[in-house]
């Protein structure tokens, strides 16, 4: 005795197509804005000591500092301000509470402090020439470097810098602008960076050169 099949089973056996419709709930997506936590810069909040022999002049977003070694100036972005306190300190503070202002706060505090130190004490970079026949001399406003090339390297010394050579292999670059001092010293080094096998080249006095063992030294 055969039992009648349900209607939905008949469609399977008879090859009938069954369309199944489903309803998918639509969810509305909302966006939320993340608040930015603008913490005060640890460096930016530190006051800047101004020596007695340094004069400060402020006009709007412009600051000028003048000392025994010369004069430097800087223009601040609108995100930061500089204030001269009665105690004689300079303080850089944020004008607005944004992430960019937080970044500018510490940067311009450092730049301002470098200016004050630069016009009062100055900055210097010392380099050492290592290699047979490597030597340096100063001729007028030019620094002459003999570094194993077919011709000596001649570098014009910027007006705001002083370059001194001792024992033909020790070069001292000094000046009031830290960035200019660093850039000129880096250019000197770039002519012959210290190579890692014998250590020949131009290096900073306090630079540690990582040495590599040559292939001959690896053979047992």
Swiss-Prot record:
Main location: plastid
InterPro entries, alphabetized: Ribosomal_uL6-like, Ribosomal_uL6-like_a/b-dom_sf, Ribosomal_uL6_a/b-dom, Ribosomal_uL6_bac-type, Ribosomal_uL6_CS
Subcellular locations according to the entry: Plastid, Chloroplast
Protein's GO biological process: translation
Alphabetized PROSITE patterns for the sequence: RIBOSOMAL_L6_1
Gene Ontology MF term list: rRNA binding; structural constituent of ribosome
Gene3D superfamilies registered for this protein in UniProt: Ribosomal protein L6, alpha-beta domain
Pfam families associated with the record: Ribosomal_L6
Transit peptide: 1-38
Coiled coil spans: none
Gene Ontology CC entries for this record: chloroplast; ribonucleoprotein complex; ribosome
Highest taxon above the source species: Eukaryota
Role this protein plays: Component of the chloroplast ribosome (chloro-ribosome), a dedicated translation machinery responsible for the synthesis of chloroplast genome-encoded proteins, including proteins of the transcription and translation machinery and components of the photosynthetic apparatus.
Recorded family membership: Belongs to the universal ribosomal protein uL6 family.
Quaternary structure annotation from Swiss-Prot or TrEMBL: Component of the chloroplast large ribosomal subunit (LSU). Mature 70S chloroplast ribosomes of higher plants consist of a small (30S) and a large (50S) subunit. The 30S small subunit contains 1 molecule of ribosomal RNA (16S rRNA) and 24 different proteins. The 50S large subunit contains 3 rRNA molecules (23S, 5S and 4.5S rRNA) and 33 different proteins.
PANTHER family named among the record's database cross-references: 60S/50S RIBOSOMAL PROTEIN L6/L9, LARGE RIBOSOMAL SUBUNIT PROTEIN UL6M
Name this polypeptide is given: Large ribosomal subunit protein uL6c
Source species of the chain: Spinacia oleracea (Spinach)
